[in-house]
């Protein structure tokens, strides 16, 4: 029933009603009320489903597994992450939820930042021989650089499913191109930010 509610929300946003859900799943409105006593409860359930039900702790494990070079880990992460969000249902639902309540997007993006993007920065620091984040927190330039890679990749879905404009069908190559640009630029940025902090030279990125 909650999946059907998310489908409706992706189409109508905050225009969703208990009756619309009952009609979609071909049950009576009183039956829906057994699961969602109020419309606010329904919206809360949809929000939880969109925001965190798909979250996989293994994503961070992939990014921090140093038995593989970083240039393999980043594409592997996106190969696992994007299938969970790359659909009209998820993008449009997320968009509607964020417009109705900015804290929705803020909470989700905070988790992306803390668990995923800071992991990439930390692993890039290690790969290029710079201090760990525990010793020196990430600065604005490092943060915006990794957000640039992530945002460009994720924005493909917004262009396709929200704006309905053409995008490359080869998502894997787009991810690789963004990663290469990031790994090419990040050591230069780190050297500018921490010119005397580099400890070693690492060949495999």
Each model region followed by its residue ranges:
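Helix-turn-helix
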Residues: 4, 8-49
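Hydrophobic/aromatic residues within well-ordered alpha-helical segments
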Residues: 39, 46, 50, 77, ...
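Amphipathic alpha-helical linker/stalk segments
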Residues: 46-77
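Short alpha-helical scaffolding segments that buttress acidic/His motifs in well-ordered protein cores
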Residues: 78-81, 94-98, 149, 153, ...
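Amphipathic alpha-helical interaction surfaces
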Residues: 80, 84-87, 118-126, 151-159, ...
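Amphipathic alpha-helical segments used for helix-helix packing
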Residues: 85-110, 158-162
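Amphipathic alpha-helical packing segments from all-alpha helical-bundle domains
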Residues: 93, 103-132, 144-147, 176-180
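Hydrophobic/aromatic-rich alpha-helical bundle segments in the mid-to-C-terminal region
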Residues: 129-180, 189-201
């Amino acid at each position: 029933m909650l999946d059907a509610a998310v489908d409706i929300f992706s189409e109508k946003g905050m225009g969703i009603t208990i009756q619309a859900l009952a009609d979609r799943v071909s049950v009576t409105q009183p039956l829906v009320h057994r699961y969602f006593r109020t419309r606010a409860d329904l919206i809360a359930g949809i929000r939880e489903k969109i925001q965190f039900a798909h979250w996989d702790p293994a994503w961070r494990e992939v990014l921090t597994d140093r038995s593989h070079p970083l240039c393999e880990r980043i594409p592997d992460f996106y190969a696992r992450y994007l299938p969970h969000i790359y659909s009209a249902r998820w993008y449009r639902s997320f968009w509607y939820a964020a417009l109705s309540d900015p804290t929705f997007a803020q909470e989700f993006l905070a988790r992306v930042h803390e668990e995923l993007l800071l992991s990439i920065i930390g692993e890039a620091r290690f790969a290029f021989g710079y201090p760990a984040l525990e010793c020196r927190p990430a600065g604005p330039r490092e943060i915006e650089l990794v957000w640039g890679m992530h945002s460009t990749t994720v924005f493909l879905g917004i262009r396709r499913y929200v704006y309905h404009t053409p995008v490359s069908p080869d998502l894997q190559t787009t991810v690789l191109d963004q990663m290469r640009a990031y790994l090419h630029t990040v050591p230069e940025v780190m050297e500018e930010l921490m010119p005397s902090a580099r400890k070693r030279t690492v060949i495999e990125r």
